[in-house]
């Protein structure tokens, strides 16, 4: 097993995992965040959110300066002390937000798929959709390598849309509330593996990894973790992993930050 004293990295999704899906509250997780910070265990946020959103949340959570994974792995924000790494401060995978937007606009115009992207509306509308303040909602529009959208067509059309995106080298990914389009080469798992390898190179030892998530788009991340917490979520599909050995994977009874705390309690407090 593992302990909080050994080289360890914690990777965590945000909405529905570390943050409450509705209120964005994270206080139930605060004691564990403090304990991990005191033990110098990096908590690496991993989300579909933009890096601008996540840097704001990172500071709120007391995790500033650490690396993070934004836009479902298409963007890696490097740790403050990694300034000598090529690409600092951010590494972007695949094609840009602007290029993806052009593809989507073409598909919508020529093939009449029905969806609304965050680029189609203003920050006031996004604030209504999400419950965020307008200033925070504005940060959700600062995509660098993905597009977030609401699907407004049938399941059959979604299958056709997904196939067209795949033909064009893109992927269509479901998040907690919205859908995301990004380069097919990007992913939370690839981004996490890159960060793990970087820590290993800097320390000379591979860290043990623990990941926490609640939605289908967290599955690739949790697959590459040594240990995983599947936080009870709202998504009807849930999270399914290839290896669900109970010694490696814990499914929580609670949702959001309560479940996050439960997962940490399970893997650490009993050891």
UniProtKB/Swiss-Prot annotation:
Annotated catalytic residues: 13 (nucleophile)
Entry keyword set: Cytoplasm, Hydrolase, Magnesium, Metal-binding
EC number from the UniProt entry: 3.1.3.70
Enzyme class: hydrolase
Subcellular localization(s) per the UniProt record: Cytoplasm
A Pfam family the protein falls into: Hydrolase_3
A single cellular component GO annotation: cytosol
Catalytic activity: 2-O-(alpha-D-mannosyl)-3-phosphoglycerate + H2O = (2R)-2-O-(alpha-D-mannosyl)-glycerate + phosphate
Similarity section: Belongs to the HAD-like hydrolase superfamily. MPGP family.
UniProt name for this protein: Mannosyl-3-phosphoglycerate phosphatase
Species the sequence originates in: Escherichia coli (strain SE11)
């Amino acid at each position: 097993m593992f302990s909080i004293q050994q080289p360890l990295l914690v990777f965590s999704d945000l909405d529905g995992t570390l943050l409450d899906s509705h209120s964005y509250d994270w206080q139930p997780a605060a004691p564990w965040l403090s304990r991990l910070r005191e033990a110098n265990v990096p908590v690496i946020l991993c989300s579909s959110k933009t890096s601008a959103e996540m840097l704001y949340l990172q500071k709120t959570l007391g995790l500033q300066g650490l690396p993070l994974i934004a836009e479902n792995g298409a963007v890696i924000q490097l740790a403050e002390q990694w300034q000598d790494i090529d690409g600092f401060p951010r590494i972007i995978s695949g094609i840009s937000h602007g290029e993806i937007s052009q593809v989507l606009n073409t598909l919508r115009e020529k093939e009449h798929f029905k969806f609304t992207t965050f680029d189609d509306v203003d920050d006031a509308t996004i604030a209504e959709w999400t419950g965020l303040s307008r200033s925070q909602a504005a940060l959700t529009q600062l995509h660098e390598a993905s597009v977030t959208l609401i699907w407004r067509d049938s399941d059959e059309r979604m299958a056709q849309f997904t196939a067209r995106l795949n033909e064009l080298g893109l992927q269509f990914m479901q998040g907690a509330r919205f859908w995301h389009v990004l380069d097919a080469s990007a992913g939370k798992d690839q981004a996490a593996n890159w960060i793990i390898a970087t820590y290993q190179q800097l320390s000379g030892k591979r860290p043990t990894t623990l990941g926490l998530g609640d939605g289908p788009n967290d599955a690739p991340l949790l697959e590459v973790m040594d240990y995983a917490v599947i936080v009870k979520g709202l998504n009807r599909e849930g999270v399914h992993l290839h290896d669900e050995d109970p010694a490696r994977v814990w499914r929580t009874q609670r949702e959001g930050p309560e479940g996050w705390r439960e997962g940490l309690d399970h893997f650490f407090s009993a050891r």
